[in-house]
Amino acid sequence: MRQKSIKKQRILWSVRITLVLLAGFLLTVSLPSQEQAGERVSKFGEYRGYSEAKYDSWVRFSQYLTMRDGIKLAIDIIRPAIEGKVHEEPLPVIWQHTRYRRAVVVDGKVRNLGDSSLNQPLLKHGYIMASADVRGSGASYGSWNGIFTKEETQDAYEINEWLASQPWCDGNVGMLGGSYLGITQLMAASTKPPHLKALFPIVALYDMYYVARPNGVFFDDFLRTWSELTRQLDTEIVAAPVIGDEDETMLKAAIEEHKQSRPLIEIFSPLKYRDSKDDVTESYPYQEWGPAGFTDEINESGIPMYLWCGWFDSFTRDGFQMYRNFTAPKRITMGAWSHSPRDPEIAKEEFGLVAVESLRWFDYWLKGIDNGIMNEDPIFYHVMRGLKDNTWQTAKEWPITEAVPAKYYFHEGPTGSVGSVNDGVLSTEKPTNSSGKDEYTVDYTTTTGTATRMDNAVGGEFNYPDMTTNDEKGLTYTTTPLKEDVEITGHPVAHLWISSTAADGDFFVYLEEVDTEGVSHYVTEGAMRASHRALHEPPYDNLGNPYHRSYEVDVMGLTPGEPVELAFDLHPTSNIFNTGHRIRITITCADKDNALTPELSPPPTITLVRNREQASHVVLPVVGAEAEVVDQGLPLLLIAFIALIVVILVIVFSMAMRKRVSKK
């Protein structure tokens, strides 16, 4: 508990600093100057000559908007200007619906949207920017009783249409923002505002249940830290007051109302199942508080969206789920970054690309500039070779057609590559024995550390350690050194045949790359609580991956000595495993710094079965390497060849019969 408390204090502090300094850091990102803009270029990450950056300054306005129920919401409007004089002709508006304060006061100065160079290119090119604090946050009145509730979403509709109705707006409205600010865009789209014409959601989630409790495993640390962060944001007098409230009377009154808000961790802790009900709001949060539950409505809106995602985000799988399920004109970029990059080099690359791509996107959809963005392949993704040696690839569909699902089976070792509980072998050869198994006494100290993809999603560091220490406390299955590069691009799926001396348990599976020095590098992960293993038809396109409904009625305990199969996907990835390196799968039953696994005494013993009948394995989407392909029936070419032979035989037989009849 002491370690978690220290970690949270560090995260809370780092987030506060980030909120203040982000604008200054992003000023290193810029588009080509007008002198460079002689030729017309529009391609991924590069844009010039299509629209003019004729505004050199901007002016902030702010006020309260009164919602249908009387709640007042604070909003900032940043209008482009030339030499300080506001442009009077109507312009498109791009706005944010934020949980993290629309503006803050630092050393007596208001920091707002105009201080971020993510927004400055848009302001310079003739877009009005706006940001509104969601109810119960910032300088807005009200209390916060849940995440992405129907009240908050209806507010978004009203704000959007108010913006469109103003004399300085030309009727074209878009939305831009990341994380919470990305999700509120999708929720706004579900209400189908007539004037909302384009979205640019950055690192947004799709399925709320999978984020909080992926396959039943409770990642409480993420929710707990976020709750403490937002509680601090809501009750400190740091949010900027609206203009006219210089004595902060209204701001202080709003903050008093915030004290009635409910912490997210208190809402979600008792909600164990996807069909759990929140009695306070009479809602089913996992079904009603997030985009997945409104897929049909979002599709009916037809609003184009550019999805911006990261391979190490906490919501990586959500990105491709949204891409497959939303039917409006769309694009997706999946880069080699986390939710909120802390490395300056990585952050500069990502934010620089966002600045360019968002301008291209809004120029096309809000201003009608035919810059060709919709003629390009809709999918851009990094193929990673280490954290920073990345190559951009494009695709027309996802999963990519070049990736072949290949089974990698678990075998007895040793490999000599790690001092784990079993040091097993990972191979494309299927087991032939009838009794293969590995036993494992659960170690509740296993952890991926305190700088994970989940930590980073709430402002923490992103820096996975050498995974060897964690590997040594779990079951591992490692290949021999690779004879050639192996590219894995897509969604790995784990199939574990397990039994336990306990009635339930959490299982964590990690895909890792072991270098020639023996250092084990984190690639991706997945998790499942054994009692949630029942498979169901998904309510949305789940990309062919196993779907666990996780209703309360679906829960099935374990019976000692009776193996069952756990099938679940890992976060997708695109990673080249270098020649001479090894592919490793590590299995543990706890991640103490990130997930809340009930500890039993004595710790249970897990048996992982790996024989010819119950062959535990992972399915890896392999590009350009030999592997045992998942049995998908006879290959199409073979089927076509057999069909051709049958047709020929029928024709020959028919001709022979006609000759016999003719002779008779």
Model-derived regions, located:
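Active-site-adjacent alpha-helix of alpha/beta-hydrolase-fold enzymes
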Residues: 317-331
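N-terminal cap/lid segment of alpha/beta-hydrolase-fold proteins
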Residues: 46-89, 478, 482-484
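Cap/lid segment of the alpha/beta-hydrolase catalytic domain
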Residues: 84-164, 515-516, 592
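Glycine-rich nucleophile elbow surrounding the catalytic serine of serine-hydrolase chemistry
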Residues: 178-187
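C-terminal, loop-rich substrate-recognition/catalytic regions characterized by aromatic stacking residues
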Residues: 47, 348-659
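Accessory cap/linker subdomain of secreted extracellular hydrolases
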Residues: 48, 112-116, 124, 190-300
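Short beta-strand/loop motif that positions the catalytic acidic residue
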Residues: 307-309
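Alpha/beta-hydrolase fold nucleophile elbow
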Residues: 167-179
